[in-house]
Amino acid sequence: MQLSGILSWLLSWLWASQTTLDLQGLYGPSLSPNAEIVLASDANYTHVTTQRWTVHGAPHYLGAIIPVTEHDIQHIIKISREHAINFLVVGAGHGATVTFERFRHGIAIDLQQFKDVHLDVDAERLTVAGATVFSDIIDPLYSAQREIVTPSAPCVGVVGMTLGGGIGSLQGLHGLLLDSLESVRLVTPIGDLIEVSETQYPELFWGLRGAGSNFGVVTSATYRTHQATHGGLVTNVDIFAATEHASIWQALSAFDDTLPPELALTLAVAYNRTIDQPLVLVNAIYYGPEEQALELLSPFTSLTPIMSRSVTVPWNALLDTTFFGLAAQEGGACAKNQAVNIYSIGLNHTDVPAWESYMEQLLQFYRQNPTYDGRFLVQRYPTQGALSTLDSNTAYPHRQIKMHINLEGWYTDPYLEDPVNAFLKQSRRHFQQSSGFDNLAVYVNYAHGDEGPDVWYTAEKLENLTRL
């Protein structure tokens, strides 16, 4: 190492060490009595702070501050600005972008104490604090015969999902989750506490809905709720498809232009090394009668699946039911500290030959890498509700996406890092060629991090966002 490199490293180490030792002195005096400061070097750090869903591309904190009041957050931000200390806000910890890996020598503002839920049944409004997750609100909403757009996992943060868009199985009926957002309480990057809505700071409210993670700390958010569809009952259909993949993609393509607003499809593809074949599971959620669901799903059910199941459940039990109940088992989308490397892309239609050729590429990669446990997820959600809001009304730029593909690399072997990244980038390019869009389209909440702001927000909206 050259002398300049040694000096740079030494100065960085000294600065980081000094900041680590001084966190209590800097932030402690003005925090409320129950707020906590935890150093990353503390033995109990991982037990008392919110852990991430994936450790791949994780940030490197000096420590975390756990505020209890909005004033605490204001104080933390003002002190951080004064001393040029970087900070990241942690809600549910479900983000997966690798851009966080570049975060060093800063602090986490851990919002774990901000989980209040208030449902005003008469006003049909729901207010949640900044770290509330969907499992906190599902039962209260169901009991009141109300609903909002929900994701496929109960551990996702309500506010975090909203700020990036908020796709879900109900979006055909109610639009994106951000379309139901009415107002937020926000601590700005300079430490001011303001309320933001269509009538208060309307330009900022525009930006918050789709690019909200860039504008401060949302301490609470208020939503319009909707009358529960079909009396609060939902049909869940699971299909374990045969290994003839071409017919599966052909069945999926049958819904390219005809997916009803009440129907949402999710396909999960994994690899069975025993039989040396990728396996496909199909989940369908239908907000209506079971007989109608089965009729609509005939393109899949006519394929003579290995196994299938259809059940009608209360909507608050839906997430425990999908994929034969496998989604609710320990692990997967809600277990913490997993190693998951995700790339994503949005499509406008299903190009069957492109899917067939990709399955061959995927099979070859599995065979070449025996310790690779990758999978991919296809979310085909209806767009009628999302498209009912003018594109110009919010910063969210991808209402026209019909299908989101998550290419998920699950592995712990560090030697797989380069080949997995190369393969998943090539996979994304493969689907981009037949995506139906001129440019790469990626939902920001699913973004890997290498796509760039033009992809996350589009060039058309980036100018306004930059001005904000």
Swiss-Prot record:
InterPro entries: FAD-bd_PCMH, FAD-bd_PCMH-like_sf, FAD-bd_PCMH_sub2, FAD-linked_Oxidoreductase, Oxid_FAD_bind_N. Induction: Expression is under the control of the azaphilone cluster-specific transcription factor azaR. Its EC number is 1.-.-.-. One of its GO terms (molecular function) is FAD binding. It comes from the Eukaryota. Pfam families: FAD_binding_4. The keyword Signal applies. Residues 1-16 form the signal peptide. Pathway: Secondary metabolite biosynthesis. It is an enzyme of class 1 (oxidoreductase). Glycans are attached at residues 44, 272, 348, 464. Its cofactor is FAD. Keywords: FAD, Flavoprotein, Glycoprotein, Oxidoreductase, Signal. Residues 54-228 form the FAD-binding PCMH-type domain. Belongs to the oxygen-dependent FAD-linked oxidoreductase family. FAD-linked oxidoreductase; part of the gene cluster that mediates the biosynthesis of azaphilones, a class of fungal metabolites characterized by a highly oxygenated pyrano-quinone bicyclic core and exhibiting a broad range of bioactivities. In the first step, the non-reducing polyketide synthase azaA forms the hexaketide precursor from successive condensations of five malonyl-CoA units, presumably with a simple acetyl-CoA starter unit. This is FAD-linked oxidoreductase azaG. It comes from Aspergillus niger (strain ATCC 1015 / CBS 113.46 / FGSC A1144 / LSHB Ac4 / NCTC 3858a / NRRL 328 / USDA 3528.7). The lineage of its organism: Eukaryota, Fungi, Dikarya, Ascomycota, Pezizomycotina. The gene is azaG.
